From Swiss-Prot:
Function: NDH-1 shuttles electrons from NADH, via FMN and iron-sulfur (Fe-S) centers, to quinones in the respiratory chain. The immediate electron acceptor for the enzyme in this species is believed to be ubiquinone. Couples the redox reaction to proton translocation (for every two electrons transferred, four hydrogen ions are translocated across the cytoplasmic membrane), and thus conserves the redox energy in a proton gradient.
Reaction equations catalysed: a quinone + NADH + 5 H(+)(in) = a quinol + NAD(+) + 4 H(+)(out)
Presence of keyword rRNA-binding: no
Family that this chain belongs to: Belongs to the complex I subunit 4L family.
Chief subcellular location: membrane
Name of the protein in its database record: NADH-quinone oxidoreductase subunit K
Amino acid sequence: MIGLNHYLIVSGLLFCIGLAGMLKRKNILLLFFSTEIMLNAINIGFIAISKYTHNLDGQMFALFIIAIAASEVAIGLGLVILWFKKYKSLDIDSLNAMKG
């Protein structure tokens, strides 16, 4: 049987993968993907703890995070599309062009 520790280990590994992606990548789109991986890792942790404590609070937090992530993707991808149309690049280094 898969225990709580297994879920939390998977959640921690996914979070570390997302964090490494956030720190290593210079592409805005890949930063969004890394953020989504981190949020899903948090959801796995919340749901696993919620299941094993028989409390629905963790599942409610997970649903709230899913709603926030969906709005983040909608707004973020819109901004990424506008960014690409204007600068023809998705690198973070081109953010210096925004300085006054």
